[in-house]
């Protein structure tokens, strides 16, 4: 299966490869540019989901041979009076079906929160604070906060895997859209 991901970030490309492999789905993953209209730091659950969906549809449109387009978006949401960083993945197909998955979320450090809510990318803030370049292309802020025990790749893989769950053949009877999905 040919799969396109709307990101040039090797971390996201690898996450898509690993998620498909997890379910035994042979996939050749290519990367395309993300849509230019996306904000650097989406705030609010609907904005994060919309970003993932927009990326997935853009990937499918940009890679004419792809059967699936994948979008991975991380952003801030409020829950329980706290602000969390969550990763959302969307998988779109040529039949128009879009499925969603979420990765684990973690509480955004207080020292970054004000800037994040103003739209500054969390990865940029982490780079400045920790003095490391290209954090989002490597371990992510979660990797820095957990001293490498949990990485951005881990969050991305889980999000994409969860977006694939409704598409697994074993789940065909559980989802109403299955008969119309390729």
UniProtKB/Swiss-Prot annotation:
Its cofactor is Mg(2+); Mn(2+). GO terms for biological process: nucleotide metabolic process; thiamine metabolic process. The keyword Magnesium applies. This is Probable inosine/xanthosine triphosphatase. Binds 1 divalent metal cation per subunit; can use either Mg(2+) or Mn(2+). PANTHER family: NON-CANONICAL PURINE NTP PHOSPHATASE_PRRC1 DOMAIN-CONTAINING PROTEIN, PTHR34699. Homodimer. The lineage of its organism: Archaea, Thermoproteota, Thermoprotei, Thermoproteales, Thermoproteaceae. It comes from Pyrobaculum neutrophilum (strain DSM 2338 / JCM 9278 / NBRC 100436 / V24Sta) (Thermoproteus neutrophilus). GO terms for molecular function: ITPase activity; metal ion binding; nucleotide binding; ribonucleoside triphosphate phosphatase activity. Substrate binds at residues 65-66. It is an enzyme of class 3 (hydrolase). Its EC number is 3.6.1.73.
């Amino acid at each position: 299966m040919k799969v396109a991901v709307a990101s040039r970030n090797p971390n996201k490309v690898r996450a898509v490869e690993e998620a498909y492999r997890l379910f035994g789905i042979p996939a050749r993953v290519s990367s395309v540019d993300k849509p230019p209209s996306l904000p650097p730091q989406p705030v609010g659950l609907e904005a994060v989901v919309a970003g993932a969906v927009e990326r997935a549809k853009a990937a499918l449109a940009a890679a004419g041979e792809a059967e699936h387009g994948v979008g991975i978006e991380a952003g801030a949401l409020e829950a329980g009076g706290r602000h969390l960083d969550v990763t959302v993945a969307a998988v779109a197909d040529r039949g128009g079906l879009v499925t969603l998955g979420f990765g684990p979320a973690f509480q955004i450090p207080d020292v970054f929160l004000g800037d994040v809510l103003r739209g500054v990318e969390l990865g940029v803030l982490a780079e400045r604070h920790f003095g490391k370049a290209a954090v989002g292309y490597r371990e992510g802020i979660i990797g820095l906060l957990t001293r490498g025990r949990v990485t951005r790749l881990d969050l991305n893989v889980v999000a994409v895997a969860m977006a694939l769950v409704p598409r697994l053949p074993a789940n065909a009877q559980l989802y109403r859209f299955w008969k119309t999905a390729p």
